[in-house]
Amino acid sequence: MTEIYRTISTGRGDDVSPTKCRERRRRRIEMRRQAAVFGEPSSSRNRDRTDMEVYSSFDVPLRKQARRSEIGGLPADIGGFLAPPAASSCQKSEAPVWKGEETEDEPLYGIVSVMGRSRKMEDSVTVKPNLCKPEVNRQRPVHFFAVYDGHGGSQVSTLCSTTMHTFVKEELEQNLEEEEEGSENDVVERKWRGVMKRSFKRMDEMATSTCVCGTSVPLCNCDPREAAISGSTAVTAVLTHDHIIVANTGDSRAVLCRNGMAIPLSNDHKPDRPDERARIEAAGGRVLVVDGARVEGILATSRAIGDRYLKPMVAWEPEVTFMRRESGDECLVLASDGLWDVLSSQLACDIARFCLREETPSSLDLNRMAQEDDNDGEQNPSRSVLAATLLTRLALGRQSSDNISVVVIDLKNSSQ
């Protein structure tokens, strides 16, 4: 993945080269986008250049051309947005946001994934509507969503985005025979928990045995340290007609908005969490404070896929939440810590609810001012995309220093 680093100027400067002019023009365009989102007047284009460049200092190119024809398989383009999983996505398009297909079987969702201020893109996002129709769900479709936040490179997060949903599908399609003791709901819950844990275990085994080059570690001639230092968090959500199943390892997070209240469906795995610290120390490791609590002073999350050199202190095993859907469920937000480091769960839910309300016009064009310069005639985004976009931009405005990936699933207007 190409690395991009920009030195942001806070003054006019004397360089009037074409490159600098283009950079300033992009910043002016970004400032006008921000004005459209945060309600500032369009006259902001007449502000002093110094103030404008400071305000848009994150300078993220939000109108990257989408280069992926499917969701799942590769990380989002640097600073760009994932392309929609539709046949028309093969055509040239520069739409910065998109919406999930609005069929009777699929939930409505919006995705945004940007590099932000980080020097490289290590996040990956996967969306697989209608993943399969397993027996455990009475032959009805299940929908898969996931956010992966890589570290030590994007190798493991990319591998997760291409493989995890396949493992989940394979586990679901197996004949899940077991003694059906207890109520029907208890049996279904045990089966789902087993499916997710086995899928995560298989994913970790693949990640720790696969080199950066894609070859099995014992068979390649690469430096073994390259594969050993790469890892990824993983938060996955499987949506069915009756339930939401979330599995999480690491510090990416899933939050359900129910009747206006934020309900965490995952718990961040941080080394200073008492139970995680005890587990790490029992495995022979240490939690050192180096710019925050870290496993052996290195990794800021206590669980992850991969990270072979920190096993067994860094565990792969996910915590699984099995929750029945209710009529008050409004939306589900999955995001990497680039969002959660600067936004609380309740604030994220409040923003998503505002965007998903019926009275909120889905035709609100976040890029109206930018389209004055490069009009592409694209359709307006859905409310789910509006929510994901606004959350991302708010995180950028709050100086988030990491990649930011956000998935917003509309549970109120999706078919059940």
Curated annotation (Swiss-Prot):
Protein EC: 3.1.3.16
The ranges of region (Disordered) come to 1-20, 32-51
Knockout-associated phenotype: Hypersensitivity to ABA, salt and sucrose during seed germination.
Q: Which Pfam families match?
A: PP2C
Task: Provide the reaction this enzyme catalyses.
Answer: O-phospho-L-seryl-[protein] + H2O = L-seryl-[protein] + phosphate; O-phospho-L-threonyl-[protein] + H2O = L-threonyl-[protein] + phosphate
Q: Which residues are recorded as binding Mn(2+) 1?
A: D149, G150
One biological-process term from Gene Ontology? response to abscisic acid
Residue sites binding Mn(2+) 2 per the record: D149, D337, D402
Where do the PPM-type phosphatase domain residues begin and end?
108-411
Which keywords does UniProt give here?
A: Hydrolase, Magnesium, Manganese, Metal-binding, Protein phosphatase
Induction field: By ABA.
Entry's Gene Ontology molecular function annotations: metal ion binding; protein serine/threonine phosphatase activity
Q: Which cofactor does the UniProt annotation name?
A: Mg(2+); Mn(2+)
**Cofactor: bound how, per the entry note?**
Binds 2 magnesium or manganese ions per subunit.
Q: Which InterPro entries match?
A: PP2C, PP2C_BS, PPM-type-like_dom_sf, PPM-type_phosphatase-like_dom
The kind of enzyme this is, by top-level EC class, is hydrolase
Instruction: Tell me which SUPFAM superfamilies the record gives.
Output: PP2C-like
What is the protein's known function?
Answer: Negative regulator of abscisic acid (ABA) responses during seed germination.
UniProt lists the family membership as follows:
Belongs to the PP2C family.
Q: What is this protein called?
A: Probable protein phosphatase 2C 75
Q: Which gene encodes it?
A: AHG1
